[in-house]
Swiss-Prot record:
It comes from the Bacteria. It is found in: Cell membrane. GO terms for cellular component: cytoplasm; plasma membrane. Belongs to the dihydroorotate dehydrogenase family. Type 2 subfamily. Catalyzes the conversion of dihydroorotate to orotate with quinone as electron acceptor. This is Dihydroorotate dehydrogenase (quinone). Binds 1 FMN per subunit. It is a peripheral membrane protein. Keywords: Cell membrane, Flavoprotein, FMN, Membrane, Oxidoreductase, Pyrimidine biosynthesis. FMN binds at residues 67-71, 91, 146, 179, 222, 250, 276, 305, 326-327.
Length: 368
């Protein structure tokens, strides 16, 4: 039914307008107790065998919503209602900003992909922190907070901007993510170089520890799929050195060649980050390389091109303790989370692994 609705309605709408329309429906459903309970019972099944622990946090399962969908933390319970075991909000910047001019979001339907150049449009760290502080949680959902650089802040002052966001948001975050990999903020990806990344991550870690003294807020970094292999290794080594809790692999790609894209050339040439199915192979490759480098010393989160339970399972075998999705949600609709959970539970039952944790990195260990 959703796929028919997508073809007849959403496909004819501007992608960003369709996003906000769907978003309003999700928020509305989450506000009505009877409807919320009914939807969660139907779309958010719980499987004991999928229970997951990552960086000290317990979750119903490994499957979460990637950053970018709920930028301002307005629908955390709504997304949990749809079956996401954790919700990563943001990207949130130190100061509010409108993002890049519209049109800035494009569907590549034949490729089951998106191109976006949103530019971190969000209400800013102060407003999002206030909303999280006032939130009365309906569902027990792990909330990650993804932070990025305000566009007008010079690159040399980036650490101060990230620290500002950390000081405002850390106490409301189950985990924090430093996003240095979006292609839509000029100069941001330069911060992935270890000489820039080391002081940035150190500053954020210190700010989080200074702000939240009653617990240690897990800190992760999100990297691009376009990094060279040597740079991936360097980030992995730095994460171990600094005692980071995790790495998220990967963000969107600026590449277009070699992806077998079938959409109209005018769409393919749009500037921005490409996400969805064409990213699958490279994101899996980056994840496997990271796990081979860090093993179980750091928690890995697999994202990029995950469309179904088999994709999620392959990420787990490649080293991901958690998996995330976003683009396929646009194409698959509200039953997507349920399908991922049911498929993963079935896959685990027919596998040689007693627990989901046993499966993490199994393929990489076999090939070592």
């Amino acid at each position: 039914m959703y796929k028919l609705f997508f073809r007849l309605v959403f496909k004819r709408m501007d992608p960003e307008q369709a996003h906000y329309l769907a978003f309003r429906w999700i928020r509305l459903a989450a506000r009505i107790p009877v409807l919320r309970t009914f939807v969660a019972a139907a779309l958010a099944p719980r499987f004991k065998e999928l229970r997951t622990e990552a960086f000290g946090l317990r979750m119903h399962g490994p499957f979460g919503l990637a950053a970018g969908f709920d930028k301002n933390a307005v629908a955390v319970d709504g997304m949990s209602m749809l079956g996401f075991d954790h919700v990563e909000i943001g990207t949130v910047t130190g100061e509010p900003q409108p993002g890049n001019p519209k049109k800035r979001l494009f569907r590549l339907v034949p490729d089951r992909a998106l191109i976006n150049r949103m530019g971190f449009n969000n209400e800013g760290s102060a407003a999002v922190a206030a909303r999280l502080a006032a939130r009365e949680a309906v569902f027990r959902t792990v909330v990650g907070v993804n932070i990025g650089k305000t566009k007008v802040v010079p690159e040399e002052e980036a650490a101060d901007d990230y620290v500002k966001s950390t000081e405002r948001l850390a106490r409301h975050a189950d985990y924090l993510v430093v996003n240095v990999s979006s292609p839509n903020t000029p100069g941001l990806r330069n911060l992935q170089a270890t000489e820039a990344l080391r002081p940035l991550l150190s500053a954020v870690r210190e700010a989080a520890d200074r702000t939240v003294t009653e617990r240690r807020v897990p800190l992760l970094v999100k990297i691009a799929p376009d990094l060279a292999d040597d740079d991936i290794d360097a980030v992995a080594d730095l994460a171990v050195e600094l005692g980071l809790d995790g790495i998220i692999a990967t963000n969107t790609t600026i590449a277009r060649e070699g992806l077998g894209l079938k959409s109209e050339p005018t769409l393919v040439k749009e500037t921005g980050g490409l996400s969805g199915a064409p990213l699958k192979a490279r994101s899996l490759e980056v994840l496997s390389r990271l796990y081979a480098r860090v093993g179980d010393r750091i928690t890995l989160v697999g994202v990029g091109g995950i469309e179904n339970a088999e994709d999620a399972w392959q990420r787990i075998l490649a080293g991901a303790t958690l998996v995330q999705g976003y683009s396929a949600f646009i194409y698959e609709g509200p039953f997507w989370g349920r399908a991922i959970h049911k498929g993963l539970a079935a896959r685990l039952r027919t596998s040689p692994y007693a627990t989901l944790a046993d499966a993490v990195g199994a393929d990489v260990r076999k090939s070592a």
